[in-house]
């Protein structure tokens, strides 16, 4: 089993965590943008059934 030789510095830990959080933030922004375009009807990549 692999074991780290030295302790990871706090700054490196913060950098990695911030990078991870930023990825989640951009995924949420994209999802919200897609939901907005579908709800307004401006989406060109989807076919949404309209209720009659």
From Swiss-Prot:
Any one GO CC term of the record: chloroplast
InterPro entries to which the protein is assigned, alphabetical: Ribosomal_bL32, Ribosomal_bL32_plant/cyanobact, Ribosomal_zn-bd
Segments traversing the membrane: none
Any one GO molecular-function label of the UniProt entry: structural constituent of ribosome
Alphabetical keyword list: Chloroplast, Plastid, Ribonucleoprotein, Ribosomal protein
Protein localization: Plastid, Chloroplast
Coiled coil segments of this chain: none
GO biological process: translation
Main location as per UniProt: plastid
Family: Belongs to the bacterial ribosomal protein bL32 family.
Protein's name according to its UniProt entry: Large ribosomal subunit protein bL32c
Underlying gene: rpl32
